[in-house]
Amino acid sequence: MPFLYSIELFKKILLGILIFSLVILAASCKGRSFLYIGFFPGEGIKGYTGSSWNNMSQGLPKDFEAEYIISDNDGTLYLTTEYSGIFKRSVSDSKWIDISSPLFKRRTQLDGVDEYRSISAFAIDPSDNSKLYLATKHVLYKSSDSGRTWNKINILDNKNSYYFTSLAVAGDTIYAGTSFNGIVSITKDSTKEINDGIPKEYYVGKFHFCEEVSSIAHINNRLYTGYLFGRGMRESSDQKNWSVLDLPIKNEKTEGVYSITTFNDTIFISTTETLYEYNTVNKRFEVSGLQSKLEKSYSDKGPTMLLVNASEKNPSLFIKRNVTEYAVEESSKWGNKQALYVAWVMIETNFKGFMDILLKNKFNAVVIDVKDDFGIINAPIESKTARELGVIKNTNIKDIIKQLHEHGIYVIARNVTFKDKRLYEAYNNKYAIWDKISDRAWVGLPWEKWCDPYSKFVRDYNIEIAKETAKLGFDEIQFDYIRFPTDGPTGRCKYRYREKDDVFKSEIMGDFLQQARQEIDIPISIDIYGYNAWYRFGNLIGQDIQFLSRFVHAIYPMVYPSHFGVSFYTRYSEAERPYMIVRDSSARSIYHSKKRTVIRQWIQDWNYNSPTWGPDYILKQVNGVIDGGGKSYSFWNPRGDHSMVNRAFSSR
């Protein structure tokens, strides 16, 4: 009998332990006992108890990408994502609640695509936690009921050009950080840029781009701002002028400030490298005592960002870590490629000389024009529309591809996309961008003819050409002029095929590339302006590097040093300027593309506005690619004459 009593007692004890454990687990899942809440790519949200990370993704979609995690004064959590919307989780909730509005939806012409625009900035009104503010890149929204309903904020003089990257609220004023326009003060009556003293890069004369404002805070009637790429912090006491704060920077190429939060007389600043504390009395920075505790919780898998719960010693803190590996260069067959461009004039007159340079210097990729700058197709493809346009040339492209493949060369087809003279002129200019003033086909530069990217026919035609090109044996399709026009009277452009007025230009480019990736059996890539590797311009010409990187295997920023403005990076000598421009272009483009696609920069191999032109100019560009974190690059010479590359590489 005593033995039986012991068994029953043991069962009761086990049951009690189990119930207690479930209670503790439930409390943990509600966020009560977690010290930190982190995002692990591919695994979701987890909570850290002090010894382990536990799942906390209940209610979240499967493959979301977190952008920001924040807590209000009551412990309610808010999670913003790249394309899955925004979620909320109060202390009493056992799962995340979707509080996204249909207003946040991505505008698309594709069937079966149902997702949200990236939430690029978020803030809670510190005086009223029911008031929430967020940005979907170029548009601001407000909720006055903790996210149950949302309304668009009308911004005077915005015109969808601002790309919002951070937000702070003080009374009736919204302070918004942007990708390249600096800091904007927004009220219902005015929109003002307050940029005297913030970090800038000058282009020509006084024309400049401001560094991306990655964080902003309004504390005790002062504004504090943090920046990307080692540009530190600024402070303003009058909301007009800015002074530099001496924030220690460990990595000048990539370190960014992502959170500025007050606690008593201390301001906590989290960068991608370190958590700092700034004493507002003695004006000194020091590494936070929390840093070593945080590092003990980190693992090889993450987290890449986390929220530190508030305590008696610190406020709630958001931390973003730059720890994701840029692995795609080594893990993909399209990575680690060093290419030369060859023009048809070179193929027809001295292809043997080109091949000698290619093989001697151990390049492993070649770019060849298929659909050229005028819409001519240099390949015997099958296309009813192309035949009607009379643009097909019967070249020996298959023999060229075969010869290159025999030497193990990766062969890339360059297809010019929306700049297409022959399609522009065909069918009575049916598919041309229109001039809303003259009521005729729009003309920018006289030698450039642009088709309307909003036209499904135009997009389908270019995808058809790419699919046919792939059948010839190419290894990759590279889309060039994958953008809207930049030169000429662009304010007169009328897009007759645009279905909705609030479509971002980047969204129609995304539609084209997402469809192309689904329909083309080989890797696809795009060329973008060099400045779009530096800043997230987004809606200006449609080349949003972060958004488009989701749909392509490789991106070619055109970072020719000669094409950056005469005032750009003049703090460096003429000799060092090519290296620094390419190095920082490499680091920035890898960062902005979220390390999910190969960055294969176009670099310069012809003498244009290059005072230090020569072999050293060539080699400094290559070193810039590598020192910026890249491995891949492509040399551009309009004729395909790479004799200077040959001289440079032979001298190494």
Annotate each predicted stretch with a short phrase.
Residues 365-370, 396-443, 478-479:
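Glycine-rich, aromatic-flanked loop segments that form ligand/cofactor-binding clefts
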Residues 552-566, 575-582, 588-652:
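Substrate-binding cleft of secreted/luminal carbohydrate-active enzymes
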Residues 30, 42, 57-72, 102-127, ...:
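Short coil-to-beta transitions that initiate beta-strands within beta-rich domains
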